[in-house]
């Protein structure tokens, strides 16, 4: 178990809509550098920060979902390598444990690889460990800044796409899981597009799937939406079909944890049935993700390892049993949406539509790789 401690902050769910919640930050107090995480498992009841002083603490936080969401996992992984280097731990061992902390989100391994490559290059160039640690930290900060810029670009491209697909505004958008500032170095992925529409007066309502079993929609997306003052409504996952049938969904916007070379998308479990509903009801189904989420080394969705979460996440609620003792639970964290069901993939480089392998390859550089390929 790693070394971490908590700091409880004042809870203000309304906040400042122009200041996205920072999911993580690097600090250098007198006792040594730390990575500070906003503990997402405690939201919305309380705002608590985890202060990680070593890599085991960060790995524990990643596996426990205190920090989650593909883009920010990449940033956390890069900072984790820097943390190991700055504090004098075995950097290669740290990188291995970080890259394998969660198997599906490709950004985690990508961030680890970038910081590790910078560290090794500095050592190979004759630098001492201190200079190599500084190089790893600089790379982590660069990735953090790049993701903030990517978030803003995705918001612009996504807003333009909505205007083309749904002229006239007044959007009613359905989203799944959580894709705001909590998963990003900026204002998010899909939620950044929603927020841009809200700021321009184009959003009528955001429909928020609760996102069973860990309720990331109810706990996190509703929390972020409330801070902005946008109109939003929470619904159970099983109510989505009736919402489509009533004509109350104009578009579905989701994020992604990994996008394969053929355009199929791994995202929070429950995304695939929304894509099927959207196709049946002739509603645009849009994926918003940075190019770091595109894994050209994974041919198709069948090659993506799907994380299986503990059964108690389904059989218990807030520690209380909701199923008979001994009940087995099927609890995949993600599912795969085929490219054929996706209207468009929005990246910082532009929009892929229709979603084909060639179109995706042309817009997205081949730089993200799975954790098994990451550290070489």
Model-derived segments and spans:
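Generic structural signal for well-ordered, non-membrane alpha-helical segments
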Residues: 51, 55-58, 70, 74, ...
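Histidine-anchored nucleotide/phosphate-binding helix
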Residues: 188-199, 275
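Conserved phosphate/anionic-ligand binding catalytic regions in large, soluble enzymes, centered on
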Residues: 64-77, 107-108, 178-186, 330-346
């Amino acid at each position: 178990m790693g070394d971490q401690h908590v700091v409880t902050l004042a809870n203000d769910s309304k906040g400042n809509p122009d200041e996205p919640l920072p999911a993580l930050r690097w600090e250098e107090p007198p006792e040594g550098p730390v990575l500070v995480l906003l503990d997402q498992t405690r939201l919305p009841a309380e705002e608590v920060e985890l202060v990680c002083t070593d890599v085991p603490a960060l790995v524990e936080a990643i596996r426990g979902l205190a920090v989650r969401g593909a883009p920010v996992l990449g940033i956390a992984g890069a900072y984790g390598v820097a943390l190991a280097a700055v504090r004098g731990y075995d950097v290669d061992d740290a990188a291995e444990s970080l890259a394998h902390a969660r198997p599906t989100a490709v950004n985690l391994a990508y961030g680890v690889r970038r910081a590790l490559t910078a560290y090794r290059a500095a050592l190979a160039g004759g630098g001492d460990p201190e200079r190599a640690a500084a190089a790893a930290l600089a790379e982590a900060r660069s990735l953090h800044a790049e993701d903030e810029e990517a978030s803003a670009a995705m918001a612009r491209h996504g807003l333009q796409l909505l205007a083309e697909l749904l002229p006239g505004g007044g959007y009613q958008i359905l989203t799944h899981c959580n894709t705001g500032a909590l998963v990003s170095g900026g204002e998010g992925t899909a939620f950044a597009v929603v927020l841009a529409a809200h700021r321009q007066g184009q959003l009528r309502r955001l429909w928020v799937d609760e996102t069973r079993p860990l309720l990331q929609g109810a706990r996190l997306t509703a929390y972020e939406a409330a801070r902005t003052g946008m109109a939003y409504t929470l619904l159970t996952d099983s109510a989505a079909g009736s919402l489509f049938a009533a004509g109350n969904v104009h578009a579905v916007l989701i994020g992604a944890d990994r996008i394969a070379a053929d355009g199929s998308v791994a995202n929070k479990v429950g995304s695939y049935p929304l894509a099927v509903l959207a196709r049946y009801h002739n509603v645009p189904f849009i994926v918003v993700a940075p190019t770091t989420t595109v894994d050209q080394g994974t041919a198709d969705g069948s090659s993506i390892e799907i994380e299986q979460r503990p059964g108690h996440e389904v059989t218990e609620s807030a520690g209380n049993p909701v199923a008979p003792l001994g009940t087995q639970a099927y609890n995949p964290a993600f599912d795969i949406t085929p490219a054929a069901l996706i209207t468009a993939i929005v990246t910082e480089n532009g929009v892929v539509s229709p979603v084909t392998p060639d179109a995706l390859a042309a817009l997205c550089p081949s730089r993200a790789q799975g954790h098994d390929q990451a550290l070489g």
